[in-house]
């Protein structure tokens, strides 16, 4: 009489952690394989979920106070008056690209205080 997969799973589920570790070691030795390879493959997708380090600040809208938004854009980007005005009027537009999270959040806060609608991507 052979043992079914369900019986094996139930037996492993009833084992202590130390017993499972010993079982894995014995299986590695018996079949000449390593359980570490399976762990490395499973860990691969987790690396893709790294936290983003560079952000883009997008001006979505200028709100009611266009002059204040232009001043805020000039201060943040170092553009001249005409360039800043053109950028603000072309919203939605990227203000800064590839900046750190802290810089992006600070820029977003200053522009929102001026009345702009801003998105950080």
From Swiss-Prot:
SUPFAM superfamilies listed in its UniProt record: ClpS-like (SSF54736), Ribosomal protein L7/12, oligomerisation (N-terminal) domain (SSF48300)
GO biological process, one term: translation
Molecular function in Gene Ontology: mRNA binding; structural constituent of ribosome
Record has Ribosomal protein as a keyword: yes
Keywords assigned by UniProt, alphabetized: Ribonucleoprotein, Ribosomal protein
Pfam family, one: Ribosomal_L12
A cellular component term, taken from the record's GO annotations: cytosolic large ribosomal subunit
NCBIfam families named in the record: L12
Entry similarity comment: Belongs to the bacterial ribosomal protein bL12 family.
Function according to Swiss-Prot or TrEMBL: Forms part of the ribosomal stalk which helps the ribosome interact with GTP-bound translation factors. Is thus essential for accurate translation.
Assembly information from the UniProt record: Homodimer. Part of the ribosomal stalk of the 50S ribosomal subunit. Forms a multimeric L10(L12)X complex, where L10 forms an elongated spine to which 2 to 4 L12 dimers bind in a sequential fashion. Binds GTP-bound translation factors.
Protein name: Large ribosomal subunit protein bL12
Provenance organism: Enterobacter sp. (strain 638)
């Amino acid at each position: 009489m052979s043992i079914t997969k369900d019986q094996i799973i139930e037996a492993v589920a009833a084992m202590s952690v130390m017993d499972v570790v010993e079982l894995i070691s014995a299986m590695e030795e018996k079949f000449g394989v390593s359980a570490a390879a399976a762990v490395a493959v499973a860990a691969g997708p987790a690396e893709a979920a790294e936290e983003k380090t560079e952000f883009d600040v997008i001006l979505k809208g200028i709100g009611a106070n266009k002059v204040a938004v232009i001043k805020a854009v000039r201060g943040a980007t170092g553009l001249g008056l005409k360039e800043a005005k053109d950028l603000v009027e072309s919203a939605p537009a990227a203000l800064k690209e590839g900046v750190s999270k802290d810089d992006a959040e600070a820029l977003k806060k200053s522009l929102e205080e001026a009345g702009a609608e801003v998105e950080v991507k």
